[in-house]
């Protein structure tokens, strides 16, 4: 089954950078919403021996100063305080978004600093020319605001990564393929024309975070530099790729980015408890290949993904896409092998749910976006 393909980053002899250390995986495993997910992802990548074809870089921990390039001092200090005490009932926590979906558990500050550091380290590798593609599957926490946690996200590592890349690259394109709207990243850059944010996501009444309608286009100097593609339940690979390619083609021509940050949350994949989109890693892989053919400095991040085995399948497959490797269908024996039953294969089959996306509505959205991008100079 091992058919060598043209690597997706062909033309670049530099191997991708892969952010990893045992300590990093161990701290990322501690997130209550995705326990041990980081270990499952890394173990499967290792089982397919993909780590041997990448440059493994140990992440630094983000300093207070680095985190404060986006987050407020007051928020960071509060996060540090409750993290040391494991104080879930601090009276100020509610105003900082802590509690409910972002519990203030002990050690949460160290977790946030580790993730932020992972993405900043990856961005720095791109700046230093150590690679053309840098991967931090444990990053991609796109909901956090400058002064509040939101949607399982305590620190917005995607924003920190973009800010770091801006030291070298003038125009940065952020593409968010998570099931949820990348609201924290969009908000952070809504007033600037230096960062364009593109988000494909589920948009429906009562679905978190409730933002990201196609009329959300940015503000002030950043007007038309936010692109939102609202999608309904049941979408599958072919239609999703058609939408993604159509939008990215227009975006690339209009904006001419110098670097790309790609958030690849796996909660769009069939079998996710979110039970919304009906994608497989192959569809996301086609979108990834489309971005990689631009041959720009590219920072790859994870994000959502609550069916842990499917998330590991997805990100391992996508790592294979980046390396130009076709992976064997049989899951290799490794520490988490039993999680891949009953069939123990890499492929994911879409479920039999109806696709709620009507072709004329999709065309309307694409036409609207194309019209908006005419204003981008």
From Swiss-Prot:
It catalyses: N(6)-acetyl-L-lysyl-[histone] + H2O = L-lysyl-[histone] + acetate; N(6)-acetyl-L-lysyl-[protein] + H2O = L-lysyl-[protein] + acetate; N(6)-(2E)-butenoyl-L-lysyl-[protein] + H2O = (2E)-2-butenoate + L-lysyl-[protein]. Its main location: nucleus. One of its GO terms (molecular function) is deacetylase activity. The active site is at residue 143. Its cofactor is a divalent metal cation. Keywords: Chromatin regulator, Chromosome, Cytoplasm, Hydrolase, Metal-binding, Nucleus, Phosphoprotein, Repressor, Transcription, Transcription regulation. Its EC number is 3.5.1.98, 3.5.1.-. Its activity is inhibited by trichostatin A (TSA) and butyrate, 2 well known histone deacetylase inhibitors. GO terms for cellular component: chromosome; cytoplasm; nucleus. This is Histone deacetylase 8. The gene is Hdac8.
């Amino acid at each position: 089954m091992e058919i060598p393909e043209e690597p997706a980053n062909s033309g670049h002899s530099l191997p991708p950078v892969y952010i990893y250390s045992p300590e990093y995986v161990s701290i990322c495993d501690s997130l209550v919403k995705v326990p041990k997910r980081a270990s499952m992802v890394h173990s499967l990548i290792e089982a397919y021996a993909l780590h041997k074809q990448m440059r493994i870089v140990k992440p630094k921990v983000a300093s207070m100063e680095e985190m404060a390039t986006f987050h407020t001092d007051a928020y960071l200090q509060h996060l540090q305080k409750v993290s040391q005490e494991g104080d879930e009932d601090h009276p100020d926590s509610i105003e900082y978004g802590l509690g409910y979906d972002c519990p203030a558990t002990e050690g949460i500050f160290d977790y946030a600093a580790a993730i932020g550091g992972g993405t900043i380290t990856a961005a720095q590798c791109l700046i230093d020319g150590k690679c053309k593609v840098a991967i931090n599957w444990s990053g991609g926490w796109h909901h956090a605001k400058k002064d509040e946690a939101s949607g399982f996200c305590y620190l917005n590592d995607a924003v920190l990564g973009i800010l770091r890349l801006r030291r070298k690259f003038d125009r940065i394109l952020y593409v968010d393929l998570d099931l949820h709207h990348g609201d924290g990243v969009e908000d952070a850059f809504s007033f600037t024309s230096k960062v364009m944010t593109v988000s494909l996501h589920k948009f429906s009444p009562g679905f978190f975070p409730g933002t990201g309608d196609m009329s959300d286009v940015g503000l002030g100097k950043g007007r038309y530099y936010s692109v939102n593609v609202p999608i309904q339940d049941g979408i599958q690979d072919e239609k999703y790729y058609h939408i993604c390619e159509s939008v990215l083609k227009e975006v690339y021509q209009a904006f001419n980015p110098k670097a790309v940050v790609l958030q690849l949350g796996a909660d769009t994949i069939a079998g996710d408890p979110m039970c919304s989109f009906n994608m497989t890693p192959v569809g996301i892989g086609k979108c990834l290949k489309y971005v990689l053919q631009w041959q720009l400095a590219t920072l790859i991040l994870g994000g959502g993904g609550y069916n842990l085995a499917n998330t590991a399948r997805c990100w391992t497959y996508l790592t294979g896409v980046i390396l130009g490797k076709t992976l064997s269908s049989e899951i290799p024996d490794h520490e988490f092998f039993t999680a891949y039953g009953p069939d123990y294969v890499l492929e994911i089959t879409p479920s039999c749910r109806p696709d709620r996306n009507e072709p004329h509505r999709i065309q309307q959205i694409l036409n609207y976006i194309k019209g908006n991008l005419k204003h981008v100079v």
